[in-house]
């Protein structure tokens, strides 16, 4: 058996994407994502197509729950993007950025996300939240002073929403990283559609 090279692992998913699903429901899901994104997403072809439909519906449910959050859509995407950057999930970085482009959000702010702590595009409240997100994601622990600084800017509900975003983004990140799923170049597709 051949051992995969580093290049092969970077380019190919660990499981071969299923291009033609068997079930009628999954064929419909493929068609809907092709319509929504301009292509069938790799996580769908690699993971969801191999699992009972309810598992794919769970990922969809996360997106629906995000719409019930009181945080601004920009803050939601900034948090998700930041977690994806820390975890190095190329697919999640790409899809998050494509959502930001589609919503005409400030791309310069997303470009500056790695320097949020010093960049004037970010408010003190955003910096406090992103410091919290950084510690929670990277260290799996948060210092009391980091929490206190964040809680000066956010309600208890908003704090719980921030924790939800970090936890649910980990689900997406680990699912994609675990199957070697990389960028689907969704930003390019989104920019062409605008």
Residue map of PLM features:
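Hydrophobic alpha-helical segments
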Residues: 1-194
């Amino acid at each position: 058996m051949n051992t995969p090279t580093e290049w092969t692992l970077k380019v190919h998913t660990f499981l071969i994407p299923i291009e033609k699903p068997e079930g009628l429901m999954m064929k419909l899901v493929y068609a809907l994502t092709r319509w929504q994104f301009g292509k069938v997403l790799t996580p769908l072809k690699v993971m969801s197509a191999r699992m009972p439909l309810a598992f794919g519906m769970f990922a969809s449910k996360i997106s629906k729950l995000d719409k019930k959050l009181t945080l601004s859509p920009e803050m939601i995407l900034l948090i998700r993007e930041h977690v994806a950057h820390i975890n190095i999930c190329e697919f999640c970085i790409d899809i998050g950025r494509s959502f930001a482009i589609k919503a005409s959000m400030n791309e310069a702010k997303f470009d500056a996300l790695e320097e949020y702590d010093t960049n004037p595009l970010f408010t003190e409240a955003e910096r406090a939240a992103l410091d919290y997100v950084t510690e929670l994601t990277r260290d799996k622990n948060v210092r009391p002073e980091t929490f206190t600084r964040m809680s000066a800017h956010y309600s208890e509900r908003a704090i719980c929403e921030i924790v939800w975003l970090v936890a649910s983004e980990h689900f997406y990140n680990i699912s994609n990283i675990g199957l070697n799923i990389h960028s689907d170049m969704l930003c390019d597709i989104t920019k062409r559609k605008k």
